[in-house]
Structures are given as structure tokens and as C-alpha cells.
């Protein structure tokens, strides 16, 4: 989780009053922070990935003002509508299609603030941007450029500019090959014939997203006006990132000015988009979740402390206005969590359960531990990944047809979380892609649930436990993975039978499936699986440069 560093001095200056340091340390957990360390000068506080609005000191201060009742409700931001536009090139639709921009004027930047802005940007890159793949952010000195602005597709060999922290004019390809940031993020653009550029009205290149800004628009302590650009592959994530940046960087009296994005392939949009979300909270539901009696008036009071606007509709319902920077609020239950925060977790009465229980080991967890011990004994390292994935990651990149029995998300928030996985193989390949800069060989495994539709099941869905493992190395081949599977099966106390298997994710003729039979007749489970060498086209899709071998097994109870 992101760790935010700030000094007492800068926090108290923005807060408008000074607190005893020990009091601040005790308050921070009350606003969903985990204080990692502190001394007489600085605090290091950890915040959950669902609260990116806390990733700068301005967001922390905003919340503290509510908790201390120095301010209540949603802050009022000075937003000025302008005629400034950014026009999007049609060629970017299949490269990096979305952009959101705004201007922030009359900011005050000293050395500390400059450092904070850079750290804020990088935290957002990691949490919302998935290390710039989904979202990338550029923050520029507005006074060095002029509108209107353009989001263009540039020729990699014919277009050049001076990248940040450089003195030499480089082509876009040279930046990817020779610049530190270019080398690190080249994988995000290399497959395309043209690369995205942010250009001003005079033809000055401001940015090459998601790689690097121009030296021309570099921020300094003399900068007073900012141009913010956010580009990406998911319009919701792009919008969320810009809204959070605009809100946080304008907390200290700066003025936000809008920019309209003109698309050839999407509806035009004006940013920032501060149109709030409205959610109704029911007093009875809040009482049941929190475990105390709450009136509608008390709910309004607690929500205003947590920086929401709230209106009592009647004794049963409170209408809540959610600011756009609170991207963690999706449902009534999220509002109820904030009611508890505003009420104060330390104020909730402690109550012992009125029944006694006896703890026993969880048999499913014990089984997982056996699997973990076997795989660790084979020199594999365990990973954990999300169950949600997308059809592109799960099927297309593995050369598979989309299956009808997959479980899909009805209203996905992002394009890369649209279904529940049916296999663990793609999760392993994604992990290897993210870690391809690390030393080889890499040997990883995962134990996790997958799901698929079954109309005969009570819930119309079946969940199954699987284990998958993968190895990337220069010498990985079918013989290697066959030996690994044989060792795994033997260590589990089984014997196996092999058959030829054809799977489009694997090289034809270098893939097999197997069934198993326990050596101990009292073994309560069995398993089957498949293994082989990953197909070169799949390796290319995941930008992997060395052979990969993998196996996957599915467990079931003996009837």
C-alpha cells in the first residue's frame, strides 16, 4: 500500500492550527490510516489502495478538517469554465484513446510541495494507473505553453523533442531506447506504429504519454500555474485520476479552469467532472450494520464530518451527496462505513458475543497448506492475484475463444475487470510480464478459486479450487515441466496417467493432460490437470522473451 511522507509543519500549516503531535498520531487511524513510523519531524502513513484521494497531504488535511469539525461537508472548489480545448487525433482510438485535462492557477510551490506533487503523481500511477498501463499523468508549467491543445499520434522516427531531465533532442524511438523512463515503459507503446503526444497551440510537444514529459514544461519552485493531462485506456479511470488531482492540488485556494476534450470517436467531455454521485442511506440498514441506534439527524452529522453533504429526507432515509474524488464509494454500505468513521470507532460500545464457540482448524486451509508445502519444496514461490479479469486477458491473449459459461460482471467499473477467471494460467503470465526485468529463472505458483456458470447449481454458479504453476527460463521445455508435474503428483501421494492434449495456449505436440489415482484408498480428494510449453504467440502477447512452461490442476472431493 502507498506510504505518504509528510512533515508536521506542512500538515499543520495547511490545517490552519497546530495539534499536539501525539494527538495527531492517534487521530490518523480514525481516518483510515495506518501510521507506519514517525519522529519529531516527519510522519510516514500508509493508506489503502481504495483511497487515492489520501495520496497527498492536501487530501489528508481535508479529511482531518472534517474529523476535527473545522469544516463540514464537501469542499467548495473555485472552478472556472473556459473555452480552452484539446482535440484528439482519430488515430489514437486503438493506441491510447482517452485524455482528460484541466488547468490549475495560483498554486504555491516550494521544494516540499514540488516533492509532494511528484510523489502524489507516482502513487496514482501505481494504484489507479497500473504502473501507467491504464492511466498516465502529466503535470506541466502552464505558462510555458499556449492553447488550444492537441492529443496527437506522432511518427516515432520523425518526431522529436527534449525529454525531461535531458539536454538532447531525441526522436520518440530514441527516447524508448536511450532514456531511463523510455526503457522502463517502452513495452506500453512498442507494438504501435505511432505514439501519443500532447502538443500545444504553437506545436510544442509537452508530453509523450505514458512515457515522459518535455523539459520545456518542467515544474520549478517558480511555477504558479499548472496544466494537467491524464491519458489512458479506460475513460472512467482517466476521469477519476484527473478529478482527484484537481481537487487535491486546489485545496489551498488555487483556481481550477476547465478544458473541453473534442473526440472524433467519443462524446466530447469537459474536465474536471465534479458532478457528484447521489446515494440514499436507510437508517435501519445503518443501525443493523453498525450495531447502534442512529437517528437520521445523527447520520447527517456524522457524514458531514467525513466530508459528504447529507440531507434528511425523513426519519428512514438520508440522501447523501458523494464528491467525485471519493472513488471508493460504490454502494450504500460504503456510506455506512463512513457513518461509523464519523461516529468514531472508539465510541462504539464493546460487546462480548452471548454464545461460546470452540475453534477448529479449517480443513480447506489445511489442504492449501499441504499444497503450498509441496510447491515450495519444488522451489516455487507463491503469488496471489485477483479473481476478476477480462476476456482479452483470459481468452484473446491465450489464443482461446470466449466461452459462454464464464461468469461476467454486470456493471464493470473498468475494462480489465469484466469477468471471473476460469483458469489461473493467465494470472501467472501477467505476473511474469510485470516482473520480466527480474533475474531468471522465475518459478511461481498460485492456489485459488475459479468460477463458471452451471444452471443446475443453486446459485447458477460453481466455484472450483485450482493450482497452477509456471516457470520462465532460457532452458524451460516439455521435459522440465513433465518432471515437475511428476514430482508434484508423487509428493501428493498419487500416481498419474498421461494422454495427449491439444490446448491453443500451448505448443501443439508439447502439451499433455493427466488423471490421478491415490496410493492411499482413504484419500478424500482427487485431481486432474494439464501441462506443457506455452505457445510463442502467447509469449508475444504477454511480452515475454523466454520460454515458459506451466501446469494447472483442478481438485475435487471423492464421492
Curated annotation (Swiss-Prot):
Q: State whether keyword ATP-binding applies.
A: yes
**Which organism is the protein's source?**
Methanosphaera stadtmanae (strain ATCC 43021 / DSM 3091 / JCM 11832 / MCB-3)
Amino-acid positions noted as binding Mg(2+) in the UniProt annotation, renumbered to this chain: 328, 334, 337-338
PROSITE patterns to which the protein is assigned, alphabetical: B5
List the subcellular locations: Cytoplasm
Keywords in alphabetical order:
Aminoacyl-tRNA synthetase, ATP-binding, Cytoplasm, Ligase, Magnesium, Metal-binding, Nucleotide-binding, Protein biosynthesis
- What's an example GO BP annotation here? phenylalanyl-tRNA aminoacylation
What SMART domains does the database record attribute to this sequence?
B3_4 (SM00873), B5 (SM00874)
Enzyme kind, highest EC tier: ligase
The name this protein carries in UniProt is Phenylalanine--tRNA ligase beta subunit
* Gene3D superfamilies in UniProt: 3.30.56.10, Bira Bifunctional Protein, Domain 2 (3.30.930.10), Phenylalanyl-trna Synthetase, Chain B, domain 3 (3.50.40.10)
Q: Which EC number(s) does the record attach to this protein? A: 6.1.1.20
Q: Which reaction does it catalyse?
A: tRNA(Phe) + L-phenylalanine + ATP = L-phenylalanyl-tRNA(Phe) + AMP + diphosphate + H(+)
- Does the record carry ATP-binding as a key word? yes
Q: Which cofactor does it need?
A: Mg(2+)
Quaternary structure, from the entry: Tetramer of two alpha and two beta subunits.
For this UniProt entry, what's an example GO CC term?
A: phenylalanine-tRNA ligase complex
PANTHER family attached to this UniProt entry: PHENYLALANINE--TRNA LIGASE BETA SUBUNIT, PHENYLALANYL-TRNA SYNTHETASE BETA CHAIN AND LEUCINE-RICH REPEAT-CONTAINING PROTEIN 47
Q: Where is the B5 domain?
A: 274-350
Q: Provide the GO MF annotations for this entry.
A: ATP binding; magnesium ion binding; phenylalanine-tRNA ligase activity; RNA binding
Major place of localization?
A: cytoplasm
Task: Give the protein family.
Answer: Belongs to the phenylalanyl-tRNA synthetase beta subunit family. Type 2 subfamily.
One Pfam family this sequence matches = tRNA_synthFbeta
Amino acid at each position: 500500500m502507498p506510504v505518504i511522507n509528510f512533515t508536521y509543519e506542512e500538515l499543520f500549516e495547511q490545517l490552519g492550527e497546530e495539534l499536539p503531535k501525539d494527538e495527531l498520531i492517534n487521530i490518523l487511524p480514525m481516518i483510515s490510516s495506518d501510521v507506519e513510523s514517525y519522529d519529531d519531524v516527519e510522519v510516514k502513513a500508509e493508506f489503502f489502495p481504495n483511497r487515492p484521494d489520501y495520496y497527498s497531504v492536501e487530501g489528508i488535511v481535508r479529511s482531518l478538517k472534517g474529523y476535527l469539525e473545522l469544516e463540514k461537508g464537501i469542499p467548495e472548489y473555485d472552478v472556472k469554465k473556459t473555452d480552452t480545448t484539446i482535440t484528439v487525433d482519430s488515430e489514437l482510438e486503438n493506441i491510447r484513446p482517452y485524455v482528460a485535462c484541466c488547468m490549475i492557477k495560483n498554486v504555491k510551490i516550494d521544494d516540499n510541495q514540488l516533492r509532494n506533487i511528484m510523489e502524489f503523481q507516482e502513487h496514482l500511477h501505481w494504484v489507479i494507473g497500473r504502473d501507467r498501463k491504464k492511466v498516465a499523468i502529466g503535470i506541466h508549467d502552464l505558462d510555458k505553453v499556449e492553447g488550444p491543445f492537441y492529443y496527437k499520434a506522432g511518427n516515432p522516427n520523425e518526431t522529436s523533442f527534449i525529454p525531461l531531465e535531458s539536454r538532447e533532442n531525441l526522436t520518440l524511438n530514441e527516447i524508448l531506447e536511450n532514456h531511463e523512463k523510455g526503457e522502463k515503459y517502452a513495452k506500453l507503446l512498442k507494438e504501435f506504429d505511432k505514439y501519443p503526444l500532447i502538443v500545444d497551440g504553437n506545436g510544442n510537444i509537452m508530453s509523450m504519454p505514458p512515457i515522459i514529459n518535455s523539459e520545456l514544461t518542467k515544474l520549478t519552485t517558480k511555477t504558479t500555474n499548472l496544466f494537467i493531462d491524464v491519458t489512458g485506456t479506460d475513460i472512467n479511470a482517466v476521469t477519476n485520476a484527473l478529478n482527484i488531482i484537481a481537487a487535491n492540488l486546489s485545496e489551498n485556494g488555487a483556481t481550477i479552469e476547465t478544458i473541453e476534450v473534442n473526440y472524433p470517436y467519443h462524446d466530447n467531455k469537459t474536465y474536471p467532472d465534479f458532478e457528484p454521485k447521489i446515494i440514499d442511506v436507510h437508517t435501519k440498514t445503518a443501525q443493523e450494520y453498525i450495531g447502534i441506534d442512529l437517528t437520521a439527524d445523527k447520520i447527517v452529522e456524522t457524514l458531514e464530518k467525513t466530508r459528504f453533504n447529507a440531507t434528511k429526507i425523513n426519519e428512514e432515509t438520508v440522501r447523501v451527496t458523494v464528491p467525485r474524488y471519493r472513488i471508493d464509494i460504490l454502494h450504500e454500505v460504503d456510506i455506512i462505513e463512513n457513518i461509523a468513521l464519523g461516529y468514531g470507532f472508539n465510541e462504539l460500545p464493546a460487546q462480548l458475543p452471548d454464545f461460546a464457540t470452540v475453534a477448529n482448524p479449517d480443513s480447506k486451509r489445511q489442504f492449501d497448506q499441504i499444497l503450498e508445502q509441496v510447491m515450495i519444496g519444488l522451489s516455487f514461490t507463491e503469488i496471489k492475484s485477483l479473481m476478476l479479469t477480462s476476456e482479452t486477458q483470459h481468452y484473446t491473449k491465450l489464443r482461446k475463444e470466449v466461452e459462454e459459461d464464464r461468469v461476467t460482471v454486470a456493471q464493470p467499473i473498468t475494462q480489465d475487470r469484466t469477468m471471473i477467471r476460469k483458469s489461473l494460467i493467465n494470472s501467472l503470465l501477467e505476473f511474469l510480464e510485470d516482473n520480466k526485468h527480474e533475474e531468471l529463472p522465475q518459478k511461481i505458483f498460485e492456489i485459488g478459486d475459479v468460477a463458471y456458470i452451471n444452471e443446475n447449481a443453486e446459485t447458477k454458479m460453481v466455484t472450483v479450487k485450482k493450482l497452477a504453476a509456471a516457470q520462465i527460463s532460457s532452458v524451460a521445455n516439455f521435459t522440465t515441466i513433465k518432471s515437475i508435474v511428476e514430482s508434484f503428483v508423487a509428493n501428493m501421494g498419487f500416481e498419474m496417467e498421461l494422454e495427449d492434449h491439444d490446448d491453443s495456449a500451448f505448443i501443439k505436440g508439447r502439451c499433455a493432460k493427466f488423471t490421478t489415482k491415490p496410493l492411499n484408498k482413504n484419500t478424500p480428494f482427487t485431481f486432474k490437470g494439464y501441462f506443457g510449453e506455452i505457445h510463442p504467440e502467447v509469449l508475444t502477447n504477454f511480452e515475454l522473451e523466454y520460454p515458459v512452461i506451466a501446469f494447472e490442476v483442478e481438485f475435487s472431493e471423492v464421492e
